[in-house]
Amino acid sequence: MRKMMETITIFDDVFVPNDRIFMDGDTEAAGTLALTFVEYHRFTAVSYKLPLVDALGGCAALAADYNGILGVTHVREKFIDLIDYAETTRALLEKSAERCIAKPNGQVAPDPMTVNLAKSHFAHGYHEAVQHVQEIAGGILVTGPGDEDWESEELRPFLQKYLAGRDGVSGEQRMKLLNFVRDLTSSDYGAYQEVLAIHAEGSLQAERLQVFRAFNENGGARRVMRLAGRMAGVR
């Protein structure tokens, strides 16, 4: 559907053998099973998104260089924001693995608090990251010439001249980079990734809810109550 690997799967009068039924009326375990899936799902989500985030940072650096604006203050600030975004997301993901929780059966799961923070940080920051890259690259992302223009013997010399970047960067070299940036940020694929950032592997609010639950489970409020009691001389 829409050129992406997505389907609508309909189960209509499907027979399921008894040996393939894993939860037969065990409703109390349903919530635990769902939440266990959530932590793994959030972990894999951030893991496979990090290369895309790194690519955005690389695109911004190259686009700024090719456009001759790498030394401009506000461009450097945007690039620093992209580094901050990528490395904070990575640090939270790695920390969720370091804080992993071992179950009695030997199964290991990511730390619920940290892995949801990682996913939330990624999702909340993705659109701003794309915006930074688009701003650095320029509006030519969507107005640049197509293949037929470059293949024209009449037009090609003009394109090479007027679309060139800083000294040493030809028009063709610059446009190859900008076409890649367009594919990541301004195409059907780019829009698809922006929607995924919001909804895939859990919505923004779902992640925040899990962070809140994990905070309560970690006993943050109970610790404060104990400290407040000690300060007031109450045990």
Predicted regions and their residues:
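Glycine-rich beta->alpha junctions and the first turn(s) of the following alpha-helix
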Residues: 1-86
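Short acidic (Asp/Glu) and glycine-rich catalytic loops that position anionic groups and cofactors
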Residues: 34-41, 98-108
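A structural signal for long alpha-helical coiled-coils and helix-turn connectors
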Residues: 61-68, 97, 101, 137
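Short, charged, amphipathic alpha-helical segments
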Residues: 76-80, 108-116
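Loop-to-helix element that buttresses phosphate recognition and phosphoryl-transfer chemistry
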Residues: 80-102, 121-124, 128, 134
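Alpha-helix capping/hinge segments and adjacent helical runs
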Residues: 113-235
